[in-house]
Structures are given as C-alpha cells and as structure tokens.
C-alpha cells in the first residue's frame, strides 16, 4: 500500500477469464512510517495508518481497514472470489511459531501480538474462522479439474529459521556448524498437517495444487535491472 498502487488487482478484477484468485500471503505489511516500503508513501499520498508499527489489535484492524480503502482492491473483492492464506507480514517479518525477526521484547509477548493479528485477519479477510484459529489449512475441490490444498508454513509448526549471520566468524563462514544445525530435526509443516495432506490427496483430479507461502525450489531470474538503467522504469 505505501510502496505503490494495486493496479494489478484491477486488471485481475476486469479479466473475465479469471474465475478464482489465490492470495498466498503478505496481504499487508506491518511496518510504521519510515519503515520498509514507506519511502514514497507521502509522495504517493498513501501514508500508513496507524503511523507506528502495528502490534495491538486496534493497530492490526486499522491497517486492514486502510488497505481496504484502495478502490482497485475493493474492485477485486467485489468481482472475484478469493482464497487467502497468511504469510509472515500479516504478523511480523520472518515470523515463526514462537516469534519473529521484526518483534522485540519491548513490544510485549509475541503470543499476544500473534493473537491480535489473527483476530483482525479473520475479521477483515474473506475466510471462515476455524475452531482452532491457527489451523488455516484446508482443501477445495473445483469440479473434477483440480484439488487445491492451502497450507500453513509460517505460524503453527515452523521452527526458527537459521540466520546466516550467526555462522560468520572472523570473516569466514562456519560451514561445519551450519551443516550440523541444518541436520537437526527441524519442522516446517508439522506432523498433523503433513498427515492431513497425505490423506486427502486424491488421484481422481487432473491437477493437485498446493498453495503455500514459501519457495519450494531455487528461483533463477534474469539480470535485467543490473543491465539496464533503473531510471528507465517507473
């Protein structure tokens, strides 16, 4: 929102060939004025509300409400059904089950912040609240064409991610310690969610689609912007 406009949402809303929208998270960002992605907010007349980083329930509600004021986003929701799932920024940057990179002790218990984010999410997003608010994984069947599984890889079972900065000593990378830590029993989706997915995948569908928040494989992108003048682009 503060970093730019949602014209892509408008194009999706107006495309009659699109019947369903999947949103895989980072629907909003938690940063306050002066934080990540807000450099052009004043120039674009898209200041964040509240101006602080969102932590309380009222904060999260206001930020959701702010995003919903965008006319292109409103159009998208009015024209297309959306199946959403959260990523990290619906809570805080690089969140995991017991914390987040962008959460500090002076902001209170992360569990409280997480509960605030969850409540606001279910209030403002097109999704039914489950008996257990954290269990967002669910399955959709679209005729006999495809089955869609929406998973959680952020908030329920995810262990704290390794920080590469912790493995540099005297300018050298401690590969031995990194490999040792990497081989520990670490979790991402959890036993319960994995068993649910394994049990519910049905071969009668032509396609089985998994919607979740993180990359499953390395991504190679062309070095377009390093070769061209960045001032040539808006």
Outline where the language-model segments fall.
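Metal-dependent phosphoester/phosphodiester hydrolase catalytic core
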Residues: 1-234
């Amino acid at each position: 929102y503060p970093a730019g406009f949602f014209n892509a949402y408008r194009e999706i809303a107006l495309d009659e060939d699109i019947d369903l929208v999947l949103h895989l998270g980072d629907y909003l960002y938690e940063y306050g004025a002066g934080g990540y992605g807000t450099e052009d907010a004043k120039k674009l007349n898209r200041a964040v509300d509240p101006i602080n980083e969102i932590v309380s329930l009222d904060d999260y509600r206001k930020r959701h409400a702010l995003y919903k004021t965008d006319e292109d986003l409103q159009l998208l929701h009015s024209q297309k059904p959306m199946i959403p799932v959260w990523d990290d920024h619906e809570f805080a940057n690089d969140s995991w089950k017991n914390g987040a990179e962008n959460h500090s002790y002076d902001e209170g218990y992360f569990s409280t912040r997480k509960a605030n984010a969850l409540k606001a999410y279910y209030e403002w997003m097109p999704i039914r609240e489950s008996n257990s608010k954290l269990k967002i994984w669910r399955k959709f069947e679209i005729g006999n064409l495809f089955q869609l599984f929406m998973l959680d890889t952020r908030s329920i079972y995810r262990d704290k991610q390794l920080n590469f900065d912790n493995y540099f000593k005297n300018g050298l990378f401690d590969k031995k310690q990194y490999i040792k830590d990497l081989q520990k029993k670490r979790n991402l989706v959890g036993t319960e969610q994995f068993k649910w997915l394994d049990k519910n995948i049905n071969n009668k569908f032509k396609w089985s689609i998994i919607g979740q928040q993180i990359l499953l494989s390395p991504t190679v992108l062309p070095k377009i912007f390093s070769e061209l003048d960045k001032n040539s682009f808006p």
